[in-house]
Amino acid sequence: MSYCRQEGKDRIIFVTKEDHETPSSAELVADDPNDPYEEHGLILPNGNINWNCPCLGGMASGPCGEQFKSAFSCFHYSTEEIKGSDCVDQFRAMQECMQKYPDLYPQEDEDEEEEREKKPAEQAEETAPIEATATKEEEGSS
């Protein structure tokens, strides 16, 4: 016997093996092709920003959402030669807001940043002698 149970926001449906093997008779509702927020990504067809895009990771709706929207909008619509150079104040306001919520917007530690900068330099040092040796060998064989 099949039955359904609601637990908070979840709806749990229990079915028998026979119910599960029977083809579904559910009718799918076609998506509204005029829905401006459906499957368009970050930029809507009209050029506006889709603040509901999952690609923004919820930044537009967090405690600094208004500051994020202001900075992002300024950058998106910027017509300066160096895009976004006219948005320093908006980005500064967003950064100040984010610093008030370090648990939600973790700052990159200076130590982590230095480590990341050192790694490419160390890798370049490791490969440099190999490349130099290969060049000398090529010159000797010519």
Curated annotation (Swiss-Prot):
Changing C53S: Does not strongly affect import and stability of CHCHD4 in mitochondria. No effect on disulfide exchange with substrate proteins. Does not affect interaction with COA7. No effect on interaction with AIFM1. One of its GO terms (molecular function) is protein-disulfide reductase activity. InterPro entries: CHCH, CHCHD4. Signal peptide: none annotated. Forms intrachain disulfide bridges, but exists in different redox states. It is found in: Mitochondrion intermembrane space. Transmembrane segments: none annotated. Pfam families: CHCH. Residues 101-142 are annotated as: Disordered. Residues 1-27 are annotated as: Sufficient for interaction with AIFM1. Its main location: mitochondrion. GO terms for biological process: mitochondrial disulfide relay system; mitochondrial respiratory chain complex assembly; protein import into mitochondrial intermembrane space. One of its GO terms (cellular component) is mitochondrion. A motif (Cx9C motif 2) lies at residues 87-97. Residues 61-105 form the CHCH domain. The keyword Mitochondrion applies. Disulfide bonds join C53-C55, C64-C97, C74-C87. The CHCH domain contains a conserved twin Cys-X(9)-Cys motif which is required for import and stability of MIA40 in mitochondria. Central component of a redox-sensitive mitochondrial intermembrane space import machinery which is required for the biogenesis of respiratory chain complexes. Functions as chaperone and catalyzes the formation of disulfide bonds in substrate proteins, such as COX17, COX19, MICU1 and COA7. Required for the import and folding of small cysteine-containing proteins (small Tim) in the mitochondrial intermembrane space (IMS). Required for the import of COA7 in the IMS. Precursor proteins to be imported into the IMS are translocated in their reduced form into the mitochondria. This is Mitochondrial intermembrane space import and assembly protein 40.
